[in-house]
Regions:
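Switch II (G3) loop of P-loop NTPases
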Residues: 1-9, 175-181
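Active-site beta-alpha connecting loops in nucleotide-dependent enzymes
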Residues: 156, 184, 191-260, 266, ...
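A glycine-rich beta-strand to alpha-helix segment
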Residues: 272-303
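Acidic, Mg2+-coordinating active-site environments of NTP-dependent enzymes
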Residues: 22-174, 253-254
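Short, structured coil segments at secondary-structure junctions
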Residues: 17, 73-75, 227, 260
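Inter-motif core of Ras-like GTPase G domains
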Residues: 17-27, 201-204
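Structural beta-sheet core signal
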Residues: 21, 60, 80, 204-206, ...
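Short gly/ser/thr-rich secondary-structure transition/capping motifs
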Residues: 2-7, 39-43, 155-156, 212-215, ...
Length: 311
């Protein structure tokens, strides 16, 4: 099998001719490509799924509202998964233990739940794993191969990547790097960090990605980022866009502060980050580097040297 990870960002997934498809969620993003028209955005997903052959099911997450709303519009076989009571493959008894997630999957026509583990924290990763298992089961892959493959899966780069320890004169912090840059992605990553490190403080360094995304989801970002225990904001990574007034790091910080959520620190020069971190990090903190821009370069530099001095 050839497995392709694709998204709707530029609608290029419409050129694929998949034999099976797995849809995890449908939520407004990349709207600049669709000229802000959500109906066009949904039409892209419909077109993608209608590229499936008549015998190829769409495996879809019933926990996601966008997915649930789309299912009645499809003229293809649909197999569902998730925690939802009506899911064909139902995720149950989820629990987190460190950087691992454990759950059971209740399958159609099988009396015994399938006990599964995946080496990534967070309910969203358990949901994604459930979707992968559902698709494998529909392909006829053996139960033993599914359990073994999932247990051996090491994750993908920049998705809650554990990059080890970062040290400075007063102690060390655990470095986690994550690519998520949509409010929902940031929210589930924060929750995963709480699940994995429930007795440790999470210090988030967040780099907003695109002025249009920051503008379009401003209130959502304020609510989600306000949940961090300590927040450092970098300037927006423009990705070729022109600046938009009120859609920058300073505006986010003011809105978070005005709601009394926390007191963010804004850094306009990335060379200042090391000094700021040295002043706010405590021993055993979790340093969560979050965003899709060049913040990944900063994470890599920290991981390579194991020291704040690398910045």
């Amino acid at each position: 099998y050839l497995v392709v990870e694709a998204d709707e960002s530029d609608a290029s997934f419409l050129h694929l001719q998949p034999m099976r498809a797995l849809v995890t969620n449908i939520e407004a993003d990349h709207m600049e490509h669709y000229e802000g028209d959500f109906s066009r955005y949904i039409q892209a997903f419909t077109g993608f799924l209608h590229n499936l052959p008549f015998y190829g099911p769409a495996v879809m997450c019933l926990d996601d509202k966008g997915v649930r709303d789309l299912i009645p519009e499809l003229s293809r076989q649909v197999v569902t998964y998730g925690r939802h009571a009506d899911a064909d493959y139902r995720l149950d008894n989820y629990r987190s233990a460190g950087l691992c997630s454990h759950f059971e999957l209740i399958r159609p026509h099988d009396a015994a739940p399938l006990a599964l583990s995946v080496n990534m924290p967070g309910l969203h990763n358990a949901q994604n794993a459930a979707g992968a298992v559902a698709l494998c089961a529909e392909l006829g892959i053996s139960e033993d191969a599914i359990v073994r493959g999932l247990a051996e899966f090491g994750g993908v780069g920049r998705r809650f990547s554990d990059l080890g320890e970062v040290r400075w004169s007063a102690g060390s912090a655990r470095l986690i790097d994550d690519y998520g840059h949509h409010p929902t992605e940031v929210a589930v990553t924060l929750q995963a960090a709480r699940d994995a490190f429930h007795d440790q403080r999470v210090v988030m360094v967040y780099q907003p990605h695109r002025f249009t995304r920051t503008r379009d989801h401003f209130d959502e970002f304020v609510s989600v980022l306000g949940e961090a225990q300590f927040l450092i904001l970098l300037d927006v990574y423009a990705a070729g866009e022109s600046a938009i007034e009120g859609a920058d790091a300073q505006s986010l910080a003011r809105a978070i502060r005005a709601r009394g959520l926390l007191e963010p620190v804004v850094i306009s020069d990335q060379r200042q980050l090391a000094a700021v971190l040295a002043g706010v990090l405590c021993d055993r903190d979790i340093l969560l580097m979050q965003g899709a821009g060049d913040i990944g370069r900063l994470s890599a530099a920290l991981a390579d040297s194991d020291s704040l001095e690398a910045l």
